[in-house]
From Swiss-Prot:
Alphabetical list of InterPro entries matching this protein: Ura-DNA_Glyclase_AS (IPR018085), Uracil-DNA_glycosylase-like_sf (IPR036895)
Reaction catalyzed: Hydrolyzes single-stranded DNA or mismatched double-stranded DNA and polynucleotides, releasing free uracil
Protein name: Uracil-DNA glycosylase
Free-text function comment from the UniProt entry: Plays an essential role in viral replication as a component of the DNA polymerase processivity factor. Excises uracil residues from the DNA which can arise as a result of misincorporation of dUMP residues by DNA polymerase or due to deamination of cytosine.
PROSITE patterns: U_DNA_GLYCOSYLASE
Active-site residues (renumbered): D68 (proton acceptor)
One Gene Ontology term of the molecular function aspect: DNA binding
Effect of P173G: About 50% loss of interaction with OPG148
Amino acid sequence: MNSVTVSHAPYTITYHDDWEPVMSQLVEFYNEVASWLLRDETSPIPDKFFIQLKQPLRNKRVCVCGIDPYPKDGTGVPFESPNFTKKSIKEIASSISRLTGVIDYKGYNLNIIDGVIPWNYYLSCKLGETKSHAIYWDKISKLLLQHITKHVSVLYCLGKTDFSNIRAKLESPVTTIVGYHPAARDRQFEKDRSFEIINVLLELDNKVPINWAQGFIY
């Protein structure tokens, strides 16, 4: 692991070698906006903004991307809910349960699945207010997602409205699926078969499919 210092909390960002090409720009951009961001109480707390930068990228095949953290109790790991109370991760688990037949589980975490990196486009929000920090993170968000897409085969974005123009923001050619948000009304997410489609796309690209059942916690 490597680390860099920034002028505001969290003061030190620890990161895996695979993120090295974007770190100097990340530090520059963060130092520009941090004082604005940190006027608010945030979800997650600043010490957890950059936790996912500890993840390697070279072994990832799929990025599952949400728009921003839970407005309360964000852990820095996208979609993670240690007490398994958040609707988004419960809906994701339910979808994977139908796909895999696994039913006796106590939780689900995308971050423990081989080949998958869960990501949030914006890395924080004001406590209780989704997308409230979008304006501050925008340059950093583009920089980091762009870097991730150089490594993965499939980018799966959850939220048809939030990600309607995501392809225009990306320079690397990456297969992109824009699906329903897990909390979408009329159970649209339930009818969405993106997890299956991702594996078909990986096989077409001669890559190993994702074992989605690995995310279950028992």
